[in-house]
């Protein structure tokens, strides 16, 4: 009988232990379910955060693309300005060649003037014996008049050529002004583009703190921005070089204008001298 009671007590104790274990298992189950729910909520929040990060990356990728397009436009404008400068250089070369040819004509005119003066001297000496050589001297004077007229015509033609060169220089000045305006516009666009690139750089840096998973993409974008910044500096350098070239061309044009003015004065003096010589021979 005592053994049965003892057995009953042991069974009762086992039952209580089993109930305690069941309650503990139920509590563990509930804790596991709560932990699972928490992890699911954290996963959903993380997915939303990553989705927002991806959207921002897409947005900044578009901004970077716009910056690249603007940089390409700035480089194209700088290239156009350099092409305009090269065209002006060619025009200056043509003007200088025309000036050289005009100087050659001037030398020819001076030579003919010297010949005409010598002929006039010979005519003056011939007038001393005009009674014996009247017909011969008249023919010689007529020939000298023809030579003087030809020399005057050459001088007038050279003067006309110089006026044409002056008109060309006026046209070149207009072209230079337009090239300078283009260079200034290119410099302004480069400055605007640099500000936009700075904004993109700041935005990309702030994106680094949002998700480590996208750090490699951000590094790539920063490298692209560095390349774009280098290209922008190169475009600015080209624009500055174009401005310096325009200034040099303007100086060359000023020098050519001064030389042109001096040559005109020289031609005017020669023309007046020819007129005086012609008048002197006519009066003789």
Curated annotation (Swiss-Prot):
The keyword Coiled coil applies. InterPro entries: Tropomyosin (IPR000533). The gene is tpm1. Homodimer. Heterodimer of an alpha (TPM1, TPM3 or TPM4) and a beta (TPM2) chain. It is found in: Cytoplasm, Cytoskeleton. It comes from the Eukaryota. Its main location: cytoplasm. Residues 1-40 are annotated as: Disordered. Keywords: Actin-binding, Coiled coil, Cytoplasm, Cytoskeleton, Muscle protein. The keyword Transmembrane does not apply. This is Tropomyosin alpha-1 chain. GO terms for molecular function: actin filament binding; identical protein binding; protein heterodimerization activity; protein homodimerization activity. The molecule is in a coiled coil structure that is formed by 2 polypeptide chains. The sequence exhibits a prominent seven-residues periodicity. Residues 1-284 form a coiled coil. One of its GO terms (cellular component) is cytoplasm. Residues 12-40 have a biased composition (Basic and acidic residues). Binds to actin filaments in muscle and non-muscle cells. Plays a central role, in association with the troponin complex, in the calcium dependent regulation of vertebrate striated muscle contraction. Smooth muscle contraction is regulated by interaction with caldesmon. In non-muscle cells is implicated in stabilizing cytoskeleton actin filaments. PANTHER family: TROPOMYOSIN. Belongs to the tropomyosin family.
């Amino acid at each position: 009988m005592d053994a049965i009671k003892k057995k009953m007590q042991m069974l009762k104790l086992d039952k209580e232990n089993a109930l305690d274990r069941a309650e503990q298992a139920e509590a563990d189950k509930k804790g596991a379910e709560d932990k699972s729910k928490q992890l699911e909520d954290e996963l959903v929040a993380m997915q939303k955060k990553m989705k927002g990060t991806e959207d921002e990356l897409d947005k900044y990728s578009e901004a970077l693309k716009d910056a690249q397009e603007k940089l390409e436009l700035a480089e194209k404008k700088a290239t156009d300005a350099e092409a305009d400068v090269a065209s002006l250089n060619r025009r200056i070369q043509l003007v200088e060649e025309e000036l050289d040819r005009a100087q050659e004509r001037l030398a020819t005119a001076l030579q003919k003037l010297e010949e005409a003066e010598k002929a006039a001297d010979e005519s003056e000496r011939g007038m001393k014996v005009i009674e014996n050589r009247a017909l011969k001297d008249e023919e010689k004077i007529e020939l000298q008049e023809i030579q003087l007229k030809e020399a005057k015509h050459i001088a007038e033609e050279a003067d006309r050529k110089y006026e044409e060169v002056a008109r060309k220089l006026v046209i070149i000045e207009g072209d230079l002004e337009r090239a300078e305006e283009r260079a200034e516009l290119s410099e302004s666009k480069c400055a605007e583009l640099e500000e936009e690139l700075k904004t993109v750089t700041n935005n990309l840096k702030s994106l680094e703190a949002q998700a480590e998973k996208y750090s490699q993409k951000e590094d790539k974008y920063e490298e692209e921005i560095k390349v774009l910044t280098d290209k922008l500096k190169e475009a600015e350098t080209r624009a500055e070089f174009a401005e310096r070239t325009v200034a040099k061309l303007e100086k060359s044009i000023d020098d050519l204008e001064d030389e042109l003015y001096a040559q005109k004065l020289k031609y005017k003096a020669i023309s007046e001298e020819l007129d005086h010589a012609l008048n002197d021979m006519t009066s003789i």
